[in-house]
Amino acid sequence: MSTIEARVEVHDADILKRAREVIDDCAGLQEVGREVIAAVDLNARWRGEECINLLAPEAPTSPGVRALLSAEIGTRAAEGHIGRENRWFAGTRHIDEVESLCVELLKKVFHCEYADHRMCASMIGNAVVYSALTDVGDTIMSVAPPVGGHSSNRRDGPAGSHGLKIVDIPVDSVELEVDLDRFNRLAPEVRPKLVALGLTMALFPFPIQQMAETVSQWGGKIFFDGAHQLGLVAAGFYQDPLKEGADIVTGSAGKTFSGPQSGIILWDDPSITKAVTDAVFPIWAATHQVNRVAALAYSAAEFLEYGEAYMNQIVKNAQALGEALQERGIPMLASHKGFTRTHQVIADVRKFGGGLEVARQLESANIITNKNLLPTDSYDDWANPGGLRIGTIEVTRLGMREEEMKEIADFIARLLVQGETTEKVGRDVLRFRSSYQTLYYCFEHGLPE
């Protein structure tokens, strides 16, 4: 019989080996359980209390959201649509209350006619869209990864697995916006059934209205994948895709929206409702983590109360951080146009060793970022691309403002530009971070002073 080491393994074999050694060294299974808890606690202390977390796809949830994620209701099954006649299981009347509150709150937050809350991740929401609105062999258009596109709308994600032909949306690699003239020439040639506007490097709005006018000539639809921008959309600090001509919107509740990890689907057109909801259930969701749904409803209520102030500060912080990094010798994309209109900025760190090396160096000093492709990179540069993606969601929720962004830029520049040691900078990061331990823009702690 083959050993684990001899098998094909996608995970890091050394880390798995250490895990097996921990299990084998434990006196009993209760001790194994304590090891799991210990690892979780270590992460909570390091990432939750000691790090400057600048990952664009992360957001810390409020105490109320975290409490609901561990609620008893999470052990209950709720297969199907809301309502006694729609459920397979009995005993769901209070679950119906929770789910209906969630749906109506989402519709209120996003000013839309329909909302679905049942996806555990926004990528699954994207899969729903492709299942509902396309057929195998259809052509779609989406953004290529080097200029910001995400895999879920490409060949190696749900779009590709659905058997779709994928054509690149032309993007200006300097302006980091859709090249509308080239799009208007290309789209009529390929006649996409769906145009997927999804970005992992999401800095600026799309010309949705103009693109929708073009594809409507042959019945094409616009799909806005707002995984990163969802909170900004809700608060009015980013374009409203549905109002500008998008037919359907997906998004992640766990990024700018700052709720539990969830996928959200939004639309206004009743003619697509059956196709979308049939794809949600029974294709992509059965029982759907009602504890998560409760937490999502709670976070939507929080967002209605605090979202505008929160998103406003997130964007201000991102623009301030981009400017501060540029001033300290770290080249930033789109510096000629204010760096960003969202929570993200992108650094060109090729001269400092590339995105992988820089992210590792910053991590050693308790500053958490991620490597990112630049428009000048190729697909072959994925392992060590030239860019670094930086986000301001978490630092904003901890009460930081523009002045703190200058301090964070100082830490990064001390490492990359001035060449100080990670040990020295890391100690200063710990001292800095110790002053920011309260999460704001939530019912428990309100707004920062």
Regions of interest found by a model, annotated:
Residues 1-86, 90-101, 213, 434, ...:
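N-terminal glycine-rich, Lys/His-bearing helix-loop that initiates the first secondary-structure elements
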Residues 2-11, 104, 316, 381-449:
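PLP-dependent enzyme catalytic core of the Aspartate aminotransferase-like
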Residues 6-12, 17-26, 94-97, 101-331, ...:
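Conserved PLP-enzyme active-site core in the AAT-like
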Residues 49, 120, 291, 337-343:
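Short Gly/Ser/Thr- and Asp/Glu-enriched loop/turn motifs at secondary-structure junctions
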Residues 54-58, 344-351, 396-397:
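Short, well-ordered beta-strand elements within core beta-sheets of diverse protein domains
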Residues 82-83, 287-290, 307-313, 325-337, ...:
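Flexible, glycine/charged-enriched surface loops at secondary-structure junctions
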Residues 300, 311, 315-360, 368-384, ...:
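Conserved small-domain helix->loop->beta segment predominantly found in fold-type I
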Residues 364-369, 416:
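A common structural junction motif
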